[in-house]
Every structure is written in structure tokens, then in C-alpha cells.
């Protein structure tokens, strides 16, 4: 059998969307090369932003220094991070839960085709974010729990959103 590797440069909800799209293309009778080519194109339309409340796991994984963690904890800062070319990149900072959710929701364009809200233990916050996105985008937002591996690296209070940009006409 033939194999084609597609590096999604993504995780969690973004990866979920690409895997689901691959399944749809398989079910529609797509060939291996057609499916891989479409996924290579579509992966550039998928985005993921996320945030955490507790900065300790970011410090332990080397993504944040001790001083920055201490100051961030005192000021109730919650970093907004994004996945860019397969790497976790700092985007901006928020203070408190309300601003954290507002800033995450602000990243998603109103015409997003598909939206996923990811969380591990923060179900209430995830539901609030999903409601905000449903109002803003008029789209059905899927809630998904992410696995413990992300929890180990980012913290179990991680909350994020992934979406697919609307297709160009």
C-alpha cells in the first residue's frame, strides 16, 4: 500500500478537523494523492489559539521563565498562545477569565466554516466561549476535550479554539 505523509503542523481541534476532512474525502472515494493534496491546501486555513490560567506547567516545560511566571501569577495574567507552523507562539496577554475568553473569541473570524472549542477541566469556561462564538459567527461550535498529553505540557486548565477559515470563492 502507498503512504503519503501530511504534516498538519497542528494539534487538538485543528488536527481533529483535518482528520475528519480526510475521512470525508475517503468516504467520497478520493484517491490517496487527491486527499493528501487537499489536506496540504486546507491545513493553511486551520488556526488554533489557546490560553491557560496556571502558568506553572508552562514554566516546567521551558516555555516560560520563573520571573515571568511569578509576575504573571500576581497580575492574574493569562497568555494567549497560538500554533504557528507547528510551534507554540506567544500572541498576547489577558487578565482574568472574562478578558481571556473575549480575546480568544476575537481571534475567530465571523465567517469561519468550522469551529471547535477545546478544554480539559474548564467545562464552564469552554461553554461560555462556545456561546460567544455561536453568537458572533452564527455557526455550530463543537466542544471537545483534549487529551492528557496536552494537559501535562500546558496545564489541565487549558482552553482554546480552533477554526477553519472560509474557503476562497
Residue ranges and their predicted role:
Residues 1-4, 10-169:
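Mixed-charge interfacial surface used for oligomerization/domain docking
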Amino acid at each position: 500500500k502507498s503512504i503519503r505523509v501530511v504534516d498538519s503542523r497542528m494539534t487538538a481541534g485543528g488536527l481533529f478537523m483535518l482528520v475528519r476532512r480526510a475521512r470525508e474525502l475517503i468516504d467520497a472515494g478520493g484517491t490517496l494523492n487527491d486527499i493528501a493534496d487537499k489536506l496540504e491546501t486546507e491545513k493553511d486555513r486551520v488556526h488554533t489559539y489557546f490560553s491557560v490560567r496556571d502558568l506553572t506547567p508552562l514554566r516546567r516545560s521551558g516555555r516560560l521563565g520563573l520571573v515571568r511566571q511569578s509576575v504573571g501569577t500576581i497580575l492574574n495574567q493569562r497568555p494567549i498562545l497560538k500554533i504557528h507552523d507547528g510551534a507554540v507562539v506567544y500572541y498576547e496577554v489577558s487578565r482574568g477569565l472574562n478578558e481571556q475568553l473575549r480575546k480568544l473569541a476575537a481571534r475567530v473570524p465571523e465567517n469561519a466554516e468550522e469551529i471547535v472549542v477545546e478544554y480539559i477541566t474548564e467545562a464552564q469556561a469552554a461553554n461560555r466561549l462556545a456561546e460567544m462564538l455561536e453568537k458572533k459567527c452564527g455557526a455550530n461550535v463543537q466542544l471537545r476535550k483534549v487529551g492528557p498529553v496536552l494537559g501535562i505540557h500546558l496545564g489541565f486548565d487549558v482552553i482554546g479554539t480552533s477554526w477553519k477559515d472560509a474557503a476562497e470563492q
